[in-house]
Amino acid sequence: MEFNIYEVRPPRAAWVIAILLVHPALLPSQTPCPPPAAAALEGGWRAYRSDSVSQALRQFRLANRLCPDNLDTGVGLGFALLRSDQVGPADSVFLSLLARNATNSDAWEGRARTALRLGDSAAAIDAGRRAVTLAPGNAELRQLLDRLSPEWDRPVAPAPRRPTSLQLVSRTRGQRFEIVTASGWKPFYPQGVNLGVALPGRYPSEFPTDSARYAGWLDTLAAMNANTVRVYTILPPAFYRALRGWNTTHPERAIWLLHGVWTELPPGHDFEHPAWKDAFQVEMRRVVDLVHGAATIPPATGHAAGRFDADVSPWTLGYIIGREWEPFAVKAFDAGKPRGTYRGRFLTLSAGPAMDLWMARQCDFMLSYEAATYNALRPIAYTNWPTLDPLTHPTEATTVEESRWRRRSGRGSESKKVEYENDVIGLDPNLIQPTTANPAGWFASYHAYPYYPDFMMHDPGYAKAHSSEGQSSYFGYLGELVQHHKAIPVLIAEYGVPSSRGTAHLHPQGWSHGGHDERAMAAVDARLTRDIREAGAAGAVLFAWMDEWFKKNWIVIDYEIPLDNTRLWHNLMDAEQNYGIMGMYAGDERTTPKLGGDIRRWRRLPSVQRARDSCTSGPRHIQMGWDESFYYIGVELPPSRFPWDSLGIQLAIDTYLPRVGQHRLPRSGVRSEIGFEFLIDLVRPDSARVFVTPEYNRHDSRIDPRTGDDFGRFSRRPVVTRNRDDGRFDSLFVITNRARFGRDGSFFPAGRYDRGRLVHGTEAASTTADWYLDDREGMLQLRIPWDLLNVTDPSTRTLLFDQRTNGDFGTAAAGEFHAGVVIYRKGKKPAVEAALPELRQGAWAASGFVGWRWSGWTEPRYHSRLKPVFDSLKALWAAPPSRAPTRLAPRAPSN
């Protein structure tokens, strides 16, 4: 049931009676109250229970004044004050009562509730625990404690004793990992998954707390033949209990843990900022403690908390600390600090830049803490990515270099780019060496995807590289990276492609950042996995376990407004939301319409337009619906094969200000009193697109046809709807790959794609299908991602409507949608065959349209299932990993 943790309920006399029956010696010595005080006390509780709080407060004050030594009058006064939002005075009353008698469960409950209101969760848990110890039947308080700290009633585990000998369960040897087994050390190739845990509707810090859920996930990963799971940050105690439970019951199929230590960027890019660095090191100690089942973390916003009593150290492969540091932060830190050396107990750096030196210190700090506290060591690395790799990339000019080449070539300057500099500075794990006191070793960890940065695709040496399966620029990059780190393992700690409809970055071999249906995603992920093995990497950890709706990427982030609400809806145009092995899909699985699926689901959609003649040869019915991903349109047509060779279908959609927009349709020439922002033109199954009025097109996707230069274009502002009567609609192209210069002046043209291209087919055939015409049932079915219609947040019914030229994009509240359907005859002189609403003298009257609106939501509906990538990697991971020799084409010489 739902329970408000701030609700103040009256104490129950039954709790006190139960305690006194068991412990009569606890009965406090109470001064009998005179009749006026007793009457006031009784009247106070009567008013309290009838929600007359102000009357109750007056009665309790009177009773307490007349009988100040009686605990019951104080309890009543405290609860009445609390319910009147006088939290501080109420807390003082309860503390005073407990100072007089520490066995009063009602006073402890009151103290728990006031502490919670005052923001002291630890004190609230302590007081609540004391209250239910005295009154075990207090179900409401138990539920409150379950919310605050699910393990509040678990017995405290004894602190682990420090072993006398060094505990070593994993280590690095050359370019590989090894784990200890009953028969000694054996090579270990980590093949696993990054565990993101933010369910739809939840922030990334709102972790599931149910051990059964984590146990189910681990069981699924094990069935996939994964042997490793990586976490970025501290998860709730339930995860570690589930991991220990799985591994103790499946010792031959243990899942090893790679644990991260998360942090944000430091203030002013100062990694030596005292408070920030202290917090980072506190987090390191916490991770070490919880891995050994010896941590208690108090509640804090955005952080897992509780008693971590599950020792998972026997299966913790190593640590990966930090995050993908932004290059501007590393550059600023290096510029402000001198180079230096570091000689720690377990790691050394003979000479290096400030950031490399800092990383060595932090990793050594964590190893030293684990050794001192638990006499244990394990391999450690810091998070790195190609943007900060130690290699040199001739095709990746810096901003200064690119500006120089632009001036020399006469191209002019570009607009401000929305991107980091991807080869301006680097971090080199080779600079750090383990000492003789460190038998666990050291490794390099990279997040490496095939489609970014652009040097992955532009470098001629990478482009010539071939794995055993054929050309692979990704394989070329990995091979050079592994060759650079000849003495240590290279773990690819993130890789993969998403099953999103939208694309954020194009790849010439088709391994793009999005734009894959789920079958294609499975095939690409399997190929990348094989390339990683063959390139000589020490392991591969796929990104990610499940789709996480809160994520966002550069190409859509400005249009997801408010950004805080992305967790409430699923944007299929946002590549970052769709990497999961476990897909998280909008709506109720039992009722959500599916392209080519149960026709009854489409026919249950609300009716918006209906033809007067139900037997017309044209469109008979328009229906609309919605879920957390899509705007659905169903159009009932005669049940017969549609003649695409001679006819086409247009759907005109008004999303905002019905009197404003485009009042004439192209091809058909239909005019309308209603203005439209969008047009869907279905020419034939292999040629269908969404178009937008020019003023409402949010992207400037112009590329010079002669040079391929985009001049840094991306966004168009303002983005509004205006009256037009010229039939013009724009395509929904967006620039995904900006034009670039190499360091030698080589030019790489910009790339773009049409977001509005619609794919025909059933959902069973392709998860990125947009529309399907069921000829047999006579039902045209469309599902349009909200983002394609410039809906910035469907949960609050918010649209893009930007009258600004800079700053944040503007929005407006959605009113009603209106839609009309036209069947037109193709040819040199297109003609209208039929329309709904019906035309009057070749035009639509505003009175002929019926508006449709959807309701917002605060809690999304969703369902989940495994994607095909589960099966493709399950089969791949069942085979023993091979380490084929790296074969690389020589790098093409640079000018």
List where the protein language model places each region.
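Aromatic-lined substrate-binding rim segments of carbohydrate-active enzymes
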Residues: 210-282, 362, 366-373, 467-468
